[in-house]
A protein has these predicted regions:
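Cytosolic regulatory regions of ion transport systems
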Residues: 1-153
Length: 153
């Protein structure tokens, strides 16, 4: 369920209603006001709130020229390299970041950029970090990898 309205209060109301009707749905809500994102997360911890990032992107581009083009490239879903996610299978054995990083780079020309073990996203994790089954993996690739052969790690 995607909720995006010009008025944040309407977005909040629609998101709360949607979560009440279908609590297991993947709920995305776009807010200009980060305080309302936090309020929705208090009532709906599974909601994914997308903040407005225009000011942050301007500041980043001022300090690191070209950053805005990089961010646009990563967000574009119709061209070039884009960010995707997958879950390390429950049936797989524990491994480490280095093994997954090297494997998906060689086999799929993808780059592992972050993991989420359930405690929040960790960007650029240490190569020695243990990856347990169920860990969410974030990567950059030209297209989504539909079937990763985890047995070849």
């Amino acid at each position: 369920i995607v909720v995006d309205n010009l008025e944040d209060d309407i977005t909040l109301s629609a998101a709360l209603y949607s979560a009440n009707v279908n609590p297991k749905a993947h709920l995305l809500a776009y807010f200009k006001d980060e305080a309302l994102s936090q309020l929705l997360n208090q009532h709906c911890p599974n909601a994914e709130c997308i903040p407005a990032v225009g000011a942050e992107m301007l500041a980043k581009a001022a300090v690191d020229p070209g950053s805005s083009a990089l961010h646009q490239e990563l967000l574009a879903s119709t061209r070039g390299m884009t960010q995707y996610s997958t879950t390390y299978p429950e049936s797989a054995s524990a491994t480490d970041v280095q093994s997954i990083f090297v494997y998906i780079k060689r086999a799929y020309q993808a780059t592992l950029i972050a993991i989420d073990t359930g405690k929040g996203i960790e960007l650029n994790p240490d190569l020695e970090k243990v990856i347990l089954p169920g860990t969410k993996l974030f990567y950059i690739a030209d297209e989504r990898i539909e079937r990763i052969d985890w047995s070849k790690i």
